């Protein structure tokens, strides 16, 4: 399963965002996931469930459908707090780098209010643009330090074997960087690695970071009066990145209020359903929250995790079934499983994802919506419902 890392300096609301993402909605019970380490958790990306489109009542197993929206579990990691010099082991640098290594994409949480300095201490008028710059530099220098270890020896060997991609893949093993990423990063470089300069290697580290560790910027504490101008600065400075105004604190408050039976959430709004539990202070807080939701169209937290999977990691949702007429499995569960697969995945890829033997003995697949047969190379589309026909017993 792909994993998203939450990164940022101390006191920007990163842990609050982690808690907001991993706090289960009231309707989602306990699912039998593997034991999660303290800094790892299960969040839910959301996508329209095909049940409404098909006019059927679904019975999910690996996910949950709430008001026609499928909630699909994904893994997130709260990366150790970041301070300048982390790549040299400063602060919790080594822990930070180990956490970083595991993630496929990042949500960089910055304090859009400008009330915390580079170390996370209280201050006034700090520029969050600097937070993004120093984080990118830390990751670049970390990749660079791994890339250049025993570089002369590696470059000579790669030159002799005429396989720089394999040499780089071996050198960067453990960083979740695949061969395609490496090929893309070096395509404009000299074919002879022994000619690569220090500047070339630093630029290569930057390219590898951009390709293999894509990132969203969460402009957190967006409800603060000083945040708006900083959010605009972030958008202007980092045009190549998705910048999302967020309030993790508001998201967490709403989830907990819903869990307590005080409110019912609907899309990017909510209604109070138990007035007896609401005192005057809470009512003022709810009015404040409503104003924020109206201004930004939501808390931004769900948007961050959705965009991380659907935009950065290019994922789509597909539904494998065994009965193409009832859209069900053998037990009669309708639309039982929602699978996240890479855009460009084929029917055979899905078969392998369901079970290795299904992939090995794949015969053909059926597009259950259109009731047509498709081949092994059929490219899956978002919200496809697919029956796999295989010689597997």
Swiss-Prot record:
Q: Which UniProt keywords apply?
A: GTP-binding, Nucleotide-binding
Q: Where does GTP bind?
A: 8-15, 78-82
Top-rank taxon of the source lineage equals Archaea
Name the InterPro entries on file: Beta-grasp_dom_sf, G_OBG, GTP-bd, P-loop_NTPase, TGS, TGS-like, YGR210-like_G4
* Keyword GTP-binding assigned: yes
Where in the numbering of this chain does the TGS domain appear?
314-390
Q: Identify a single GO molecular function assigned to this protein.
A: ATP hydrolysis activity
Provide the OBG-type G domain boundaries: 2-266
A GO CC term attached to the entry: cytoplasm
**One Pfam family in the UniProt entry:** TGS
Keyword Manganese assigned to the entry: answer is no
Family designation: Belongs to the TRAFAC class OBG-HflX-like GTPase superfamily. OBG GTPase family.
This one is known as Uncharacterized GTP-binding protein MJ1332
Organism annotation = Methanocaldococcus jannaschii (strain ATCC 43067 / DSM 2661 / JAL-1 / JCM 10045 / NBRC 100440)
């Amino acid at each position: 399963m792909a994993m998203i890392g939450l990164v940022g300096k101390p006191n920007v609301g990163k842990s609050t965002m982690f808690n907001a993402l991993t706090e289960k909605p009231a309707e989602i019970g306990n699912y039998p996931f593997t034991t999660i380490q303290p800094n790892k958790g299960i969040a839910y990306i959301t996508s329209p469930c095909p049940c409404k489109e098909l006019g059927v009542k679904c019975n999910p197993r690996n996910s949950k459908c709430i008001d026609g929206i499928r909630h699909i579990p994904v893994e997130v990691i709260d990366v150790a707090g970041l301070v300048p010099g982390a790549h040299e082991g400063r602060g919790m640098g080594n822990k930070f780098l180990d956490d970083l290594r595991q993630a496929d994409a990042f949500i960089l949480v910055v304090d859009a209010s400008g009330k915390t300095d580079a170390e996370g201490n209280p201050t006034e008028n700090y520029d969050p643009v600097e937070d993004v710059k120093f984080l990118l530099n830390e990751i670049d220098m970390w990749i660079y330090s791994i890339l250049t270890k025993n570089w002369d020896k590696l470059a000579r060997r790669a030159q002799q074997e005429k396989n720089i991609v394999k040499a780089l893949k071996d050198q960067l093993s453990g960083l979740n960087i695949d061969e395609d990423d490496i090929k893309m990063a070096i395509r404009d470089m000299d074919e002879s690695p022994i000619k690569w300069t220090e500047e070339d290697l630093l630029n290569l580290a930057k390219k590898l970071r951009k390709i293999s560790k894509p990132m969203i910027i969460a402009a957190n504490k967006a409800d603060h009066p000083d945040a708006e101008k900083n959010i605009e600065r972030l958008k202007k400075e980092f045009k190549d990145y998705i910048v999302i105004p967020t309030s993790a604190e508001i998201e967490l408050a709403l989830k907990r209020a819903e869990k307590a039976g005080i409110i019912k959430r609907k899309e990017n709004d909510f209604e109070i359903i138990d007035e007896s539990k609401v005192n005057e202070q809470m009512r003022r807080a709810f009015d404040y929250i409503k104003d924020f939701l109206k201004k930004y169209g939501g808390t931004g937290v769900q948007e961050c995790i959705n965009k991380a999977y659907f935009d950065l990691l290019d994922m789509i949702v597909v539904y494998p079934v065994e009965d193409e007429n009832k859209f069900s499995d053998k037990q009669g569960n309708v639309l039982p499983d929602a699978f996240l697969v890479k855009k460009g995945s084929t029917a055979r890829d899905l078969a392998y994802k369901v079970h290795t033997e299904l992939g090995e003995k794949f015969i053909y697949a059926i597009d259950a919506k259109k009731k047509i047969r498709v081949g092994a190379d059929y490219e899956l589309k978002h919200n496809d419902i697919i029956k796999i026909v295989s010689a597997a017993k």
